[in-house]
Amino acid sequence: MHRQSSKSGVALPPVGQGPDACQMLSRAQLGQDPPQRTVLGVLTENEQYRRTCGQEITAIRCFSGSENVFPAAGKKVLSDHGVNEPAKRGFDIYMDDPEQGDRDTCSGKEGIIFEDVYEVDTSMLKSDLHFLLDFNTVSPMLVDPTTHAQSEEATDFGSDVINVTEYAEEIHRYLREAEVRHRPKAHYMRKQPDITEGMRAILVDWLVEVGEEYKLRTETLYLAVNFLDRFLSCMSVLRGKLQLVGTAAILLASKYEEIYPPDVDEFVYITDDTYTKRQLLRMEHLLLKVLAFDLTVPTTNQFLLQYLRRQGVCIRTENLAKYVAELSLLEADPFLKYLPSLVAAAAYCLANYIVNRHFWPETLAAFTGYSLNEIVPCLSELHKACLSIPHRPQQAIREKYKASKYLHVSLMEPPVVLPLQ
């Protein structure tokens, strides 16, 4: 059975089960010649098929209509099989355990009233998680990305207000206090009934690709992942809504961090219209409620930039440190149990050792108060992540840092053993 592509109007062949079957007619075959854009494929929990340059994918719509539409008030939604399913919330609020203490509480969750209850097609709950994005079709955001693109390398150490030398120590002390207040729960995934660590990794990998496609700043990515983790620390989410939460998180982070954030319609587009603009805006509203509108949070990236300014290194070491730090975003366990300032210190140590065969300079030990012994546990976890990343299905970060502007640092091989004893 053939179907029509919603964006090109071309009849597409049936979709097969393997990676080679997920192809669509190229624009060259259609007689069109627009600039080629990166293709982000269909992702599943267990495997991500990486495609060679030039391959295109079929835009596959994997969610039923009832999954992604808000029902009218007072009406019930029928499942695809014509059976009335009991109403099910797309989100639930966790109640903190008494022993968690004030540190793990989620500000803003009390008193949240859900006026609209999501109706969920239960046939989808056990299916694979898919992310839909095909950049070969025409985007609603027809803006030349070079028009407003900033040189992030030029602004990182230049005009960034967190790097003002005169106030560096005071700013660092403030950020160290703030990172504790805005820390997600380290093991929140244990309380999630329908999503897994693997699904979160796929979502973060997809967010990295979205950031690269729209030339978003690195800090925007870190903020989006922070918003996502803090939201999931308080709310249980069904897998059919996980991408909606992630998209709302990067939309919110873009509005906060970017000078020229992509339009809301652009974020609807990157999900292949799986969610409506209304759904995305309402999810953004819910995200803000749960986060109590507290969006100014310290990230690993901010601390790393402070360290690099305090103790300068060569450009290769700097890029390698950024790459290693970004790898920590993929895994909630174990990296959420470490503070962002400590993860940044571990990333600095690992990159510095790989390039210069030194770990933690005395200058930074005095500035941060971290000794090498305190950094070692996180450093060991980051080292494992670096060794395993070539064999993982999530390759967006590695592909990003293969670029010449980062000096191909993701191709550098870390030593198998670190002399930490």
UniProtKB/Swiss-Prot annotation:
Task: Tell me the function of this protein.
Answer: May be involved in the control of the cell cycle at the G1/S (start) and G2/M (mitosis) transitions. May primarily function in the control of the germline meiotic cell cycle and additionally in the control of mitotic cell cycle in some somatic cells.
Top-rank taxon? Eukaryota
Q: Is Ubl conjugation one of the keywords UniProt gives this record?
A: yes
GO terms under biological process: cell differentiation; cell division; meiotic cell cycle; spermatogenesis
Gene3D superfamilies per record: Cyclin-like
Q: Which SMART domains match?
A: CYCLIN, Cyclin_C
Where this protein primarily resides, as one coarse class?
Answer: nucleus
UniProt cross-references to Pfam families, sorted A to Z: Cyclin_C, Cyclin_N, Cyclin_N2
Name the record gives this protein: Cyclin-A1
User: Which InterPro entries does the record associate with it?
Assistant: Cyclin (IPR039361), Cyclin-A_N (IPR032447), Cyclin-like_dom (IPR013763), Cyclin-like_sf (IPR036915), Cyclin_C-dom (IPR004367), Cyclin_N (IPR006671), Cyclins_cyclin-box (IPR048258)
Tissues expressing this chain: Testis and ovaries.
Regarding how it is modified after translation, the entry says: Polyubiquitinated via 'Lys-11'-linked ubiquitin by the anaphase-promoting complex (APC/C), leading to its degradation by the proteasome. Deubiquitinated and stabilized by USP37 enables entry into S phase. Ubiquitinated during the G1 phase by the SCF(FBXO31) complex, leading to its proteasomal degradation.
Phenotype seen when the gene is deleted: ales are sterile due to a block of spermatogenesis before the first meiotic division, whereas females are normal.
User: Which keywords does this chain's UniProt record carry?
Assistant: Cell cycle, Cell division, Cyclin, Cytoplasm, Cytoskeleton, Developmental protein, Differentiation, Meiosis, Mitosis, Nucleus, Spermatogenesis, Ubl conjugation
Protein's cellular compartments: Nucleus; Cytoplasm, Cytoskeleton, Spindle
Gene Ontology cellular component terms for the protein in this record: cyclin A1-CDK2 complex; cytoplasm; nucleus; spindle
Q: Which family does it belong to?
A: Belongs to the cyclin family. Cyclin AB subfamily.
